[in-house]
């Protein structure tokens, strides 16, 4: 009986063992045969990675080779909590200052943590990101600190395994990602912010591969992004369980091609001069904004383009969109009296008038098309030249009427209004020039004084440059050339002539008229320079109210645009103030800023003086007659005094 029971037990044990071995065998067959390919691919995916190798983004430099934007490669500092063991406090205390983190925060990140993987298994996290964008110099300090880190034990008395723990802790516990990140740096901060723009992180696809890297978001960074960005590389390799590359298992390694460097026409010294003068204007007059553009009339080269308020492209998100907007190309305003140069140029070029021709300005009260236009002074008979000198609204209107709508419209568009200038910056608008069919009977008397038309500050500057450049309109030139990393010129950008708007003879006549604006009898006496003749025009435009017919009381856009030396211009300088306080006439608030910039710019560029100093002009601070915005009957919805 006992033998029978023992036999049954042995039989049951044999059956159980057989079933166990059968299950194990099936599992082995399932893993090694039936699902071998599937599991092999999954294992390969778990280990194999494709690493993006970002090319070095090209530098941006000014015309003198000064660095405006550059890129540095930075580390991502990581930790393996397993190798740190129970030394979190010691490690945190040692490297927290280098990472600019609190010890408590870093201590928490170094703690050992577990998680559930896809199979439901508990795994330990051996890859913890501590800090991104760590400069290479800082990373080296961290490595040196870890290598010399004391732990308060006599390591000579440690066992082999204990000594190995401390060795791995020093050498491997804190590590960096295998591929560095790229950080865009703007050394001069806000100096050229609205020209340079800034970058952000964007995804792009090359050869079927999708990469995420820095990309231009605004300004030159956006417009020249394809040239600056370069071509990414990639690396197909395998990593260990701490996401560190196993170099011997690399399958592909394609080198990136660095981006090109861009050399701008901007001169940092000129830009600084303009920006300092604008900052002073902001302090004195508290305008909503202040802008300045400095151009070489003969070539269209932009030497300075500044707008305040501005922003630091190293941290563009610190300010709102309003401060990041490039008002020189994005904002449109009624230009006011600066637009009188267009109607007078057109009339002279068409032979409709001469500078000596006279018009009756009717003591400052002119009725036309059922409305009344006023001058700021009760002028009687004025010559065409004096109409420019005194900035007479009635005189400009009568010249426009004599010229006619078709001719005026043609010259407006020929001077570039209603079209983008083509400057390589994002966000430029075309302004507003209404087609002839939409003009009212009143338009021909209002457009000559800068009403019923909206322009960008840059359009107005380039129109003045055309007069200074013997009647030839140029395209703004902002990028001088592209170079490779070795300094070889890849592309050279030449000045571009748009069209001959007026004849050279007409341009010379306009220069003579515009010189008188800066005389003691003109509206911009405060723009006069001691050693140089200046030609220019003031503007004081009453601002419209968005969505409301008419103009905003007490809100003005003040302008002065001038060039020097007047007969052989090297520089055209424009200053714009939006809603200045404590004075608003262009000759009163913008002209002195022009003078300050022009004096420093002429000295810096060693421009040859064209006049002998005159004691009466030295330190001239006397204001000449100030032009005022046109006044019409309030029922018209146009500007009033």
Where are these regions (language model features)?
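Small/polar-residue-rich segments within soluble enzyme cores
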Residues: 91-97, 114-258, 575, 592-595
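Juxtamembrane extramembrane loops of integral membrane proteins
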Residues: 51, 55-100
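Envelope-exposed proteins and targeting segments
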Residues: 54-57, 73-77, 91, 124-126, ...
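Beta-lactam-recognizing serine transpeptidase/beta-lactamase-like catalytic domain environment
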Residues: 7, 69, 238-253, 257, ...
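Solvent-exposed, polar/charged alpha-helical surfaces in well-ordered, non-transmembrane soluble domains
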Residues: 75, 89-93, 97, 108, ...
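Hydrophobic alpha-helical transmembrane signal-anchor segments
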Residues: 4-38
């Amino acid at each position: 009986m006992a033998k029978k029971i023992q036999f049954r037990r042995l039989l049951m044990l044999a059956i159980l063992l057989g079933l166990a071995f059968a299950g194990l065998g099936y599992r082995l067959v399932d893993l090694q045969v039936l699902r071998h390919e599937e599991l092999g691919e999954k294992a390969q995916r778990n280990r194999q990675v494709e690493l993006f190798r970002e090319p070095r983004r090209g530098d941006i430099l000014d015309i003198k080779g000064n660095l405006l934007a550059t890129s540095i490669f930075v580390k991502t500092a990581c930790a393996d909590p397993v190798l740190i063991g129970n030394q979190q406090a010691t490690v945190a205390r040692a490297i927290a200052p280098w990472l600019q983190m609190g010890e408590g925060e870093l201590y928490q990140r170094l703690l050992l943590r577990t998680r559930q993987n896809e199979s439901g298994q508990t795994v330990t996290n051996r890859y913890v990101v501590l800090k991104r964008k760590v400069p290479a110099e800082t990373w080296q300090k961290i490595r040196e600190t870890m290598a010399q880190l004391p732990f308060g034990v006599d390591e000579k008395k440690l066992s082999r395994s204990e000594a190995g723990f401390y060795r791995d802790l020093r050498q491997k516990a804190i590590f960096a990602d295998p591929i560095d990140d790229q950080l865009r740096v703007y050394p001069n901060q806000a100096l050229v912010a609205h020209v340079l723009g800034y970058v952000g992180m964007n995804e792009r696809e090359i050869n079927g591969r999708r990469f995420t890297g820095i990309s231009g978001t605004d300004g030159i960074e956006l417009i020249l992004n394809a040239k600056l960005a370069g071509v990414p590389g990639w690396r197909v390799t395998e990593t260990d369980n701490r996401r560190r590359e196993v170099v011997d298992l690399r399958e592909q390694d394609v080198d990136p091609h660095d981006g090109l460097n861009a050399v701008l026409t901007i001169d940092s010294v000129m830009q600084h001069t303009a920006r300092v003068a604008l900052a002073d204007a902001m302090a004195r007059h508290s305008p909503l904004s202040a802008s300045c553009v400095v151009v070489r009339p003969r070539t269209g080269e932009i030497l300075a383009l500044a707008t305040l308020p501005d922003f630091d492209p190293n941290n563009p998100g610190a300010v709102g969109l309003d401060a990041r907007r490039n008002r020189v190309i994005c904002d449109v305003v009624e230009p006011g009296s600066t637009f009188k140069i267009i109607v007078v140029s057109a009339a002279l070029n068409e032979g409709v008038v001469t500078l000596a021709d006279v018009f009756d300005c009717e003591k400052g009260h002119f009725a036309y098309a059922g409305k009344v236009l006023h001058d700021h002074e009760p002028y009687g008979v004025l010559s065409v030249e004096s109409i420019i000198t005194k900035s007479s609204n009635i005189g400009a209107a009568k010249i426009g009427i004599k010229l006619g709508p078709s001719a005026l419209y043609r010259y407006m568009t020929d001077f570039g209004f209603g079209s983008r200038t083509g400057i390589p910056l994002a966000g430029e608008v075309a302004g507003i020039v209404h087609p002839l069919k939409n003009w009212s009977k009143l338009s021909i008397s209002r457009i000559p004084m800068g009403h019923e038309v909206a322009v960008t500050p840059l359009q107005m500057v380039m129109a003045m440059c055309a007069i200074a450049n013997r009647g030839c309109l140029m395209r703004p030139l902002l990028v001088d050339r592209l170079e490779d990393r070795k300094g070889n010129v890849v592309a050279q950008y030449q000045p571009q002539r748009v069209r001959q708007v007026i004849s050279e003879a007409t341009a010379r006549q306009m220069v003579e008229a515009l010189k008188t604006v800066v005389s003691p009898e003109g509206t911009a006496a405060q723009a006069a320079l001691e050693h140089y003749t200046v030609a220019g025009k003031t503007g004081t435009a009453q601002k419209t109210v968005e969505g409301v017919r008419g103009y905003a009381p007490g809100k003005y856009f003040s302008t002065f645009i001038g060039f020097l030396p007047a007969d052989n211009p090297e520089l055209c300088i424009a200053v714009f103030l939006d809603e200045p306080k404590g004075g608003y006439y262009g000759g009163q608030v913008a002209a002195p800023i022009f003078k300050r910039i022009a004096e420093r710019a002429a000295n810096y560029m060693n421009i040859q003086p064209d006049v002998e100093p005159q004691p009466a002009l030295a330190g001239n601070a006397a204001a000449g007659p100030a032009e005022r915005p046109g006044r019409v009957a309030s029922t018209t919805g146009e500007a009033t005094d």
